């Protein structure tokens, strides 16, 4: 008996789903998705209207981005500048620097 009750409730729910799908396709009910018109009118050459949440999120993420860039540059600058040793100018010769010898005056 309990199996018949479960089967009847299953058939009832399935029938509701079938009817609601048919009504939605016929336009007699169901979910209304839009009013048929444009919700936001386009504005030619004007900035979009931003909400406070959008402004806060954009400032937060841009601040986070610049923090990450500056942090990485400060702590791992060789990733940007390269892994080259800085040359020691005291080891350069006058010839390499283009300085003429003293006895050629």
From Swiss-Prot:
Q: Where is the transit peptide?
A: 1-33
Membrane topology, as annotated: Peripheral membrane protein
Enumerate the subcellular locations listed in this protein's record, separating them with semicolons. Answer: Mitochondrion inner membrane
Instruction: Report one GO cellular component.
Output: mitochondrial inner membrane
Q: Which UniProt keywords apply?
A: Electron transport, Membrane, Mitochondrion, Mitochondrion inner membrane, Respiratory chain, Transit peptide, Transport
Cite the residue spans of the region called Disordered: 85-105
What is an annotated GO biological process for this record, any one? mitochondrial respiratory chain complex I assembly
Q: Where is the composition biased (Acidic residues)?
A: 95-105
Provide the assembly information: Complex I is composed of 45 different subunits.
Tell me, in a sentence or two, what this protein's role is.
Answer: Accessory subunit of the mitochondrial membrane respiratory chain NADH dehydrogenase (Complex I), that is believed not to be involved in catalysis. Complex I functions in the transfer of electrons from NADH to the respiratory chain. The immediate electron acceptor for the enzyme is believed to be ubiquinone.
Q: Which family does it belong to?
A: Belongs to the complex I NDUFB2 subunit family.
Name-wise, this protein is NADH dehydrogenase [ubiquinone] 1 beta subcomplex subunit 2, mitochondrial
- Recorded source organism is Pongo pygmaeus (Bornean orangutan)
